Amino acid sequence: MGALRVLRYVSMIWRPELGSCARQRDAGFGTEARRPSQPHRSSKHKDLVEDQPFPGLLRTENLGLEELAHVLRAAVVDQKGPLVTLNKPQGLPVTGRPGELTLLSVLPQLSQALGLEHQELQVVRAPGKEASGLVLLSSCPQTASRLQKFFIHSRRAQRPTATYCAVTDGIPEPSEGTVCMPLKMEQMNDVDLAVPVMSPSRKDIQEGVKRTLSRFHVMATGRGCALVQLQPLTVFPNQLQVHMALQLCPILGDHTYAARVGTVLGQRFLWPAETTKPQRQVLDEALLRHLRLSPSQVAQMPLHLHLHRLLLPGTGSRDPPSELLAPLPPYFSRTLQCLRLSQQ
């Protein structure tokens, strides 16, 4: 796949307005899902669109370094001075094993594509592999250090700097609140999982149990699902997925922690986290009809968790924070339209 082909691919797939359900604005995220026109395409371009495992999902694992660099170059939402902000596709890890395609592995090619050949980019802030959204890069170590100090100080003061949006299977009750739960990492079948610790001892804390805290606010509801705003106040792997599962409302596309939520006679409950293995998320038939998905597509459903907003320090010590926004990915906008999730 050449560079021209990748750029055309990006224009077809990585657009915030791409969708396939009713034309209607989503819940306040500044994107719109439209039924795309069907221009004549070559068979290769047609295959790129039609063989996607989930509608509107960009599969970065099928790209090479140069191709991914072009995709990320097209995903840049802001570039000022040493700072580069881009909208990361879902499924792209920040780090990984040697030879694995990651955000770090593509930074040299991305720097060249941005005209920064002699300036080394480093990651300042980024969502995890399964989430999409804002990635903050810097070519200046001093700027990166200043930003890291700002984020650390904000966490200590419990001032959220990151705002995610998520679609949940189920509607959290109450509609807003705070989830506070100690978590630890535990390996199960060679998979590292975040596990709640109800009453951690001093020994637990010494062995790595961390207090985690997140705020949530339901922005819209529809078809038994919710569009939820999430603001983590601590940093822990998979914190938001675990917190939503604890609310009995797992995030759509969470094929790791959704299995902890069981249902008996229409009532939801939590399975023991220590003995519940990750498995593909199971959705009821009515929800599948609303989403217009085939069984094979459901198995490939991406995590509907998007880092939508970041606050950065102002230029002066007394200046208010500045704001960065990233539009929703196409599959996320499509889901909002199919579930009729509009701002209430």
Curated annotation (Swiss-Prot):
This is Mitochondrial mRNA pseudouridine synthase Rpusd3. Residues 1-36 form a transit peptide. It comes from Mus musculus (Mouse). Transmembrane segments: none annotated. Residues 25-53 are annotated as: Disordered. Catalyzes uridine to pseudouridine isomerization (pseudouridylation) of specific mitochondrial mRNAs (mt-mRNAs), a post-transcriptional modification necessary for their translation. Acts at position 390 in COXI mt-mRNA and at position 697-699 in mitochondrial COXIII mt-mRNA. As a component of a functional protein-RNA module, consisting of RCC1L, NGRN, RPUSD3, RPUSD4, TRUB2, FASTKD2 and 16S mitochondrial ribosomal RNA (16S mt-rRNA), controls 16S mt-rRNA abundance and may play a role in mitochondrial ribosome biogenesis. It is found in: Mitochondrion matrix. Keywords: Isomerase, Mitochondrion, mRNA processing, Transit peptide. It is an enzyme of class 5 (isomerase). One of its GO terms (cellular component) is mitochondrial matrix. It comes from the Eukaryota. Its EC number is 5.4.99.-. Forms a regulatory protein-RNA complex, consisting of RCC1L, NGRN, RPUSD3, RPUSD4, TRUB2, FASTKD2 and 16S mt-rRNA. Belongs to the pseudouridine synthase RluA family. One of its GO terms (molecular function) is pseudouridine synthase activity. It catalyses: a uridine in mRNA = a pseudouridine in mRNA. InterPro entries: PsdUridine_synth_cat_dom_sf, PsdUridine_synth_RsuA/RluA, RluA_PseudoU_synthase. Pfam families: PseudoU_synth_2. One of its GO terms (biological process) is mRNA pseudouridine synthesis.
